[in-house]
Amino acid sequence: MTRWLICSLTTGGPQMIPPREYTLVRFPFAAESYDPDKLHPAQQPDTGRTVTSSDPRAGLIWPRHDAWAHLAAMMVWQDIADLDAADRPTHVRHRFVRDPLNLVTGYDSTATSDHRPRPAGTGGTCRTKTWPIFVHPGTPLGYLVYHDAALPMRLESAEFKVSYTMEAA
């Protein structure tokens, strides 16, 4: 019998993202939309330490098996009309990363996408992505975002999802 392992995370509100650096999106531990297998635990599997939603580790999903997985993500940025014209971004990016905090095997990014923001006054820039990837126990996954505005920008909302199957014993 095939068993699905699914972790579906959503941000609890806006996060300020600094300019010109990839930032690991953090997800609250109490607001999981779906995580029955505890792939997004507050108690970190590598250290046993419990972290809060403000810790960068709140952005990690910890697969528990070697598997071929499906990743999905969504980002929604603020409307750039909120920024002076000289401070606006020319592009936003997002990517998936194995070990984004260099805890185990080293930073390994994949599926980087680069997009122009929507014109000012037409709403926030929203992008989705999916990507298949091999996952391994002990190697966390993360979803990172980037912009090139002159000032920090609001990531209004984000989601990060991982799913894979295992043969049940």
Question: Residue spans of the language-model regions?
Answer:
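Extracellular jelly-roll beta-sandwich "head" domains, especially the C-terminal globular C1q domain
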Residues: 1-169
